[in-house]
Amino acid sequence: MAKYVFFISTEPYKYQAVDTLIEIAKAALKKGHEISGIFFFGTGVYNLKKEISCGNSIRNIPEKIEKFSRENNIPVAGCSTWVSITGLKEHEFIEGASEEGLGDFSNWAIDADKLIVFGTGG
């Protein structure tokens, strides 16, 4: 079975990247594959902010990530440089998320069989 790592650099509500990521990851897990981690880069780190204001009629992306990662024991990390640039603090993150550098992400990617990237597209 394959080992997957996901990389996401899109904001929570601009695209459906997180929704798509979770559905792909669920399908991979169902087939017996492993998810080694989900790394948030650039403005994608905003996906990790637990106190995001989305109202009652919009899905809560950070909550979806937290629930999925907790239920499946998947590491979730935000790029330390981008966390600093955006002014986020690690205590503002969803439960289980951490702040990691690109070196840590590189180790995840090297150990993975598949790297799936969700970016802004261009």
Question: Model-found features: residue ranges?
Answer:
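Extreme N-terminal starter segment of soluble prokaryotic enzymes
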Residues: 1-5
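Short, glycine-rich nucleotide/cofactor-binding loops
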Residues: 6-19, 47-53
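Short glycine-enriched, charge-decorated loop/helix-capping segments at active-site entrances
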Residues: 51-56, 92-95
